Amino acid sequence: MSRYRGPRLKIIRRLKTLPGLTSKRPKNRKDSMNRSSSRKISQYRIRLEEKQKLRFHYGLTERQLLKYVRIARRAKGSRVRSIAITEMRLDKSFSIGYGSTSGARQLVNHGHIRVNDHMVDIPSYPCKPQDVITIRDQQRLRAIIKKNIDLFQRDKLPNHLTFHSLQYKGFINQIIDSKWINLKINELLVVEYYSRQA
């Protein structure tokens, strides 16, 4: 299944707020709200909606999400969460401080991002502690990123990242702490949804 490129407000109406998908808010529709509240919601639908929240928030394909759930289930020692794995992707790490996830994904795809002085053009590249993320030295590219920095730097940076706006450089300090993840989701329901496949 490919990445979703359809109407985003349609998804927001169904799954509620997803900061990674869009910052727009749908208008209240009283008729549809009354109809939906009278329906009985099945356990399958509850699990499906939690899974879809995770998928649409991070812009993942079905295959990518299943892969992260499998990695999280196989991890030994401390419990590794699939949501923490997705937060450590290059497109997500780069987007914090530089712009939106979709914009970051495009910059990565076009080969504008370097990790530890090596060009990386895979948005799903897993970042690790001590990684240094920089951009190619292009004046036009820096102007675009400077504009994004002014827009997105109002929010406090998560503790797993350090960002130097003047040098256009980011550092991965550690694996992200769950309290910094701005998506409220019941991961157990996602694991239960995939229990027959993972």
Curated annotation (Swiss-Prot):
Gene3D superfamilies linked: Ribosomal Protein S4 Delta 41, Chain A, domain 1, RNA-binding S4 domain
Compartments, record wording: Plastid, Chloroplast
Gene Ontology biological-process annotations: ribosomal small subunit biogenesis; translation
Key words of the record: Chloroplast, Plastid, Ribonucleoprotein, Ribosomal protein, RNA-binding, rRNA-binding
One Pfam family cited in the UniProt record for this chain: Ribosomal_S4
Record-linked InterPro entries: Ribosomal_uS4, Ribosomal_uS4_bac-type, Ribosomal_uS4_N, S4_RNA-bd, S4_RNA-bd_sf
Molecular function terms from GO: rRNA binding; structural constituent of ribosome
Region (Disordered) location: 17-40
Record carries keyword Ribosomal protein: yes
Sequence ranges assigned to domain S4 RNA-binding in this UniProt record: 88-154
Keyword Ribonucleoprotein among UniProt keywords: yes
Gene Ontology cellular component annotations, sorted alphabetically: chloroplast; small ribosomal subunit
Subunit structure: Part of the 30S ribosomal subunit. Contacts protein S5. The interaction surface between S4 and S5 is involved in control of translational fidelity.
Primary role: One of the primary rRNA binding proteins, it binds directly to 16S rRNA where it nucleates assembly of the body of the 30S subunit.
Family note: Belongs to the universal ribosomal protein uS4 family.
HAMAP family: Ribosomal_uS4_B
Protein name: Small ribosomal subunit protein uS4c
Organism for this UniProt entry: Pinus thunbergii (Japanese black pine)
